[in-house]
Amino acid sequence: MRPVHTTALIAGTLALGLSACTVSVRPNLGLQVSGSNLISGLKPDRGEGSTYAVGESVRILVGTRSAGYITLVALQSNGYASVLARNVYVQPGTTAFPRAQDGVAFTVAPPRGVQRVRAIFTRVRPSSDLVVSGTYDSSGFNTVTNAYVTSYAQEDRDVQETFFYIR
């Protein structure tokens, strides 16, 4: 049995350490992430949960551990979904989207609120294109993207999601 003063010291130290913690709350995105660990990072250029004003440019940074194909899909706060990049071949490492050769910019536009961006990675070139257009709730968005990747072996696919705010 531990002496009372040791337990009190541990509890006091723990309380002091925890008082310096910051708790960040993020939306419940409901994404079922694969366990293959092929995407090593996904975030907007200012970091996950950052804020962008309407009219500003945003880049999405995707890190991968293997060569393969990336599709980026956006889900706006009003539920409208669209494909930002489709079946783009990437080498291992970090790729910033849009790439210079894409000849486009991702310019932030209304609606204001949470903008979700989902990266879908496959080691092999997808045999079909992900068709996403229209309005989805979280469940419908998950259903569409999950159905797209299930034809690929679990070790050959990964899905991750990030978000930022539009003000």
List the predicted regions and their residue ranges.
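Sec-dependent bacterial lipoprotein signal peptides
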Residues: 1-19
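Secretory-pathway glycoprotein ectodomains that are cysteine- and/or Ser/Thr/Pro-rich
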Residues: 21-65, 69-167
